From Swiss-Prot:
Role of this protein: Transfers the 4'-phosphopantetheine moiety from coenzyme A to a Ser of acyl-carrier-protein.
Listed GO biological process terms: fatty acid biosynthetic process
Taxonomic lineage from the root: Bacteria, Bacillati, Bacillota, Bacilli, Lactobacillales
Residues involved in Mg(2+) binding: D8, E59
Descriptive protein name: Holo-[acyl-carrier-protein] synthase
Record-annotated membrane-spanning stretches: none
GO cellular component labels: cytoplasm
Species, as recorded: Lactococcus lactis subsp. cremoris (strain MG1363)
Length: 119
């Protein structure tokens, strides 16, 4: 049974502006493991795309979960990894059930869709 759905999109230019304003922005969004992957990318464009995708995915999860971000849920309560085929998934989350995630990018934006499913 579907518990919740969430979708979020973010313009890459908005993420780039946030990076320009604050070097700590990355650390506020990404977990230690995600930050290691981010730092391994060579190009600024790829880093921005990766960060935008993680931002959108975490925002989409917070909407599907029904709380948004605040006391009940923070960015670091969520962690995203990729399986052996490259498919992203939440490796860390507070939901007791299945979590489905899709992330897509274009030259201008990133979008993510999350479905939370209870057994």
């Amino acid at each position: 049974m579907v518990f919740g759905t969430g979708v979020d999109n973010v313009e890459l230019s908005r993420i780039q502006k946030a990076l320009t304003r604050s070097e700590r922005f990355v650390e506020q969004v990404l977990t230690t493991m995600e930050l290691e992957k981010y730092n391994n990318f060579q190009s600024t464009a790829r880093k921005t795309e990766f960060l935008a995708g993680r931002w959108a995915a975490k925002e989409a999860f917070s909407k599907a979960y029904g709380t948004g971000f605040g006391k009940a849920l923070g960015m670091h309560d969520l962690e995203i990894k990729n399986d052996e085929l490259g498919k992203p998934y939440f490796s860390k989350h507070p939901f007791e059930g299945q979590v489905h995630l899709s992330i897509s990018h274009s030259n201008l934006e990133a979008v993510a869709f999350v479905v939370l499913e209870k057994n």
